[in-house]
Amino acid sequence: MGNFYRKNIEILGQQRFLYPLLFQDEFYAIAQNLFSNPRASVEVREEICKNCNSFSFFTVKRLIFKIRKRNVFLESKNKNSISLALIAEGLTLGLDVFFSAQWKRFVDGEGGTEQLSFQSIHSIFAYLDETTPYSFSSLGIRIPSYVHPELFIRMFNCLCWIDDVCFLHLLSSMLCFLKHLTILDKFIFFNSKGFIRLVLFLWNIFVSKGESSKISLWKQKCYRAKFKSFGSFAEQTHFHRKMKLKNPKIKAHEKFSEVFFFSHYSRFGEKSVLIGTPILIKKYRYFFCHFWQTSFFFSETYGLFVHEFSRKNISLIGYSFYFQNHRTFFRIKMFYDFFFTELVNNEFHPKFGIISIMKFLSIEGFCDIMGRPISKLSWTCFTDDDIFDKCDRFWKILYYYYCGAKNKAYLDRIKYILLLSCFKTIAFKHKSTIRVVRKEFDFELRKKFFPKEIEFERDFLCSRFAQKFKKWLLKINLATERFWLLNILKVHFLTKSWHKDQDALDFCLIVEKNNILPMLNNFL
């Protein structure tokens, strides 16, 4: 794939011609390895491997011809469902390669002036660390997941991203043909990871393009708007210092407009949060409803739910955020007297829910529903060192993700559950008791695999900061300071697991019977 990618990087970047990629034999082998469903049965995996190995130029050409002629149902339904899933995986991988090439050219300075970022979770954490001096209200928007398939094709044609007519025609045939899959095995096709990734990929491009046009409107209406784009920092794993901006002098009649348009906006998946003044929130409630209604060509605003949060109830990506007034007192001395004054500023204080993490650990098999540690039976086939390594890696992932929380001291409970579950797993494997295992492995495990969080965090930060910041790190108290260790791409499954459960009662989603996105709500 590397050689093929290097040879065709110029074609992908300039000519936008993706149709020949679908006739490469190794292309489907790569797609099958990337998008294979780990929960599929052994028979399904063997059938997928057989179909993947038997793919050739004539097989793909014959299958594409049947898709366009609507004759796929003539053969056995199980075989064709797997073949259609492989075609969807090939389409997804082709689009992924194309946009990855465009993103690389944009970061290197060779691309255009506008590029979409599909890994925007880095900007969310930098956004959560900002202060909101004029913001007192928040608005939550649930974007509908229903998109007509022709809007995807029209999007590519209007933006001139892909000029390959054959590729777009095949994509249109695939998406429009899904309503006719009455004889095929829909369960295998809809649950294939390649199809879900294809639909999610197209949906994310569509919504991101709508947001880019929305930001352009904000720039026209808002004077002196500072829109910070964190897309170019997508490859970094930490933010060590905020950018210092030189504020120009503001005239008296311009201060009100600056306060009025001061807002914070962030989106992850189908859920977005807007924080601003109460007047701004009321105006944007009307604006968002009509904006997404016209973008999705809805006759009515069904499927779009706008909810105004209270000041202490903002839930996003596994965190619960609340505002807290940070007061700074000043003593102003006059010629004959002095008086006290204060400066009030709103700050984000993120917290994580212990109950949500307990549910996640119970699903993973570390504890029961009540939080009591149990042995993880799926790890009994590994060696003791592998069990320690897996448990330690899982703990570090949780600590990376929640080290910026206000209540990160509660992570000691999670650490205790993982540690005791590890002991029970080893005791069950050796048919021994927990007391014997703790006497034998307790000191070694705590010394090697569970170091103190402060020392571990300090070593982690010092290894990644520049030399001039190491002295500063040795002076601050890391037990009270919040740090975002933005190694987020490796723990992306946490956001998918908890993002679905949060605010389930506040949002409603209408999915039609013949909708092309039946699995999108389960995936997000």
Swiss-Prot record:
Q: Which GO terms describe its cellular component?
A: chloroplast
Task: Tell me the superkingdom of the source.
Answer: Eukaryota
Which Pfam families did the record assign? Intron_maturas2, MatK_N
- Classify the main location: plastid
Q: Which UniProt keywords apply?
A: Chloroplast, mRNA processing, Plastid, RNA-binding, tRNA processing
* Location relative to the cell: Plastid, Chloroplast
Gene Ontology molecular function terms on file: RNA binding
| UniProt xrefs under InterPro entries | Domain_X, Maturase_MatK, Maturase_MatK_N
- Does this UniProt record's set of keywords contain Repeat? no
Q: Which GO terms describe its biological process?
A: mRNA processing; RNA splicing; tRNA processing
Q: Which HAMAP family match?
A: MatK
Summary of the function given for this chain in its UniProt record: Usually encoded in the trnK tRNA gene intron. Probably assists in splicing its own and other chloroplast group II introns.
Q: Which PANTHER family match?
A: MATURASE K
Of which family is this protein a member?
Answer: Belongs to the intron maturase 2 family. MatK subfamily.
| Protein name, as recorded | Maturase K
